[in-house]
């Protein structure tokens, strides 16, 4: 893990993720105001699916921006961009961290409503709405990055 993170981890279960994303969807009502969703790949694909279902939106685009290599944040690379200025669109990502990706998204889609499920202090001012505050130094373990594994008991016979 990068030197900027402490040992603190925030582990997100599928149930928590779904509950928080549905709360975000409620804040985006009425659904009729939206033309579509732009998911920031890859983390934004998961909340985009929930938002699309809850808001009955069928038009889902992607913007693919690479900024992490494993758990290290690096240079931004736009791999694919939805062709719109964002008017009438929700742009969604799972998390805003330092704000580097968010700044690029804002530049690309200035008229979009930009939302995330989780936000850290450095990035939070760059988006329009989010559900959960996360301390800047805390690493988030998203459910799509985890597997269920056996953990041996602390006490052995």
UniProtKB/Swiss-Prot annotation:
It is found in: Cell inner membrane. Xanthine binds at residues 97, 140. One of its GO terms (cellular component) is cytosol. It holds the Pfam family Pribosyltran. CDD domains: PRTases_typeI. Guanine binds at residues 97, 140. InterPro entries: PRibTrfase_dom, PRTase-like, Xanthine_Guanine_PRibTrfase. Its cofactor is Mg(2+). 5-phospho-alpha-D-ribose 1-diphosphate binds at residues 42-43, 93-101. It is a peripheral membrane protein. Pathway: Purine metabolism; GMP biosynthesis via salvage pathway; GMP from guanine: step 1/1; Purine metabolism; XMP biosynthesis via salvage pathway; XMP from xanthine: step 1/1. It catalyses: GMP + diphosphate = guanine + 5-phospho-alpha-D-ribose 1-diphosphate; XMP + diphosphate = xanthine + 5-phospho-alpha-D-ribose 1-diphosphate; IMP + diphosphate = hypoxanthine + 5-phospho-alpha-D-ribose 1-diphosphate. Keywords: Cell inner membrane, Cell membrane, Glycosyltransferase, Magnesium, Membrane, Metal-binding, Purine salvage, Transferase. GO terms for biological process: GMP salvage; IMP salvage; purine ribonucleoside salvage; XMP salvage. Belongs to the purine/pyrimidine phosphoribosyltransferase family. XGPT subfamily. Purine salvage pathway enzyme that catalyzes the transfer of the ribosyl-5-phosphate group from 5-phospho-alpha-D-ribose 1-diphosphate (PRPP) to the N9 position of the 6-oxopurines guanine and xanthine to form the corresponding ribonucleotides GMP (guanosine 5'-monophosphate) and XMP (xanthosine 5'-monophosphate), with the release of PPi. To a lesser extent, also acts on hypoxanthine. Homotetramer. This is Xanthine-guanine phosphoribosyltransferase. The gene is gpt.
């Amino acid at each position: 893990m990068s030197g900027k993170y402490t040992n603190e981890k925030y582990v997100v279960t599928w149930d928590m993720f779904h509950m928080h994303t549905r709360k975000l969807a409620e804040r985006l009502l009425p659904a009729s105001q939206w033309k579509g969703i732009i998911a920031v790949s890859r983390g934004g694909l998961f909340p985009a699916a929930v938002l699309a279902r809850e808001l009955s939106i069928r038009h889902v685009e992607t913007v693919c921006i690479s900024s992490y290599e494993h758990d290290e944040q690096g240079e931004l690379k736009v791999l694919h961009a939805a062709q719109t200025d964002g008017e009438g669109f929700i742009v969604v990502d799972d998390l805003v961290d330092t704000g580097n990706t968010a700044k690029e998204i804002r530049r690309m889609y200035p008229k979009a409503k930009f939302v995330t499920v989780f936000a850290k202090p450095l990035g939070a001012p760059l988006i329009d709405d989010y559900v959960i505050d996360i301390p800047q130094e805390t690493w988030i373990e998203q459910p799509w990055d985890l597997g269920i594994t056996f953990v041996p008991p602390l006490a052995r016979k």
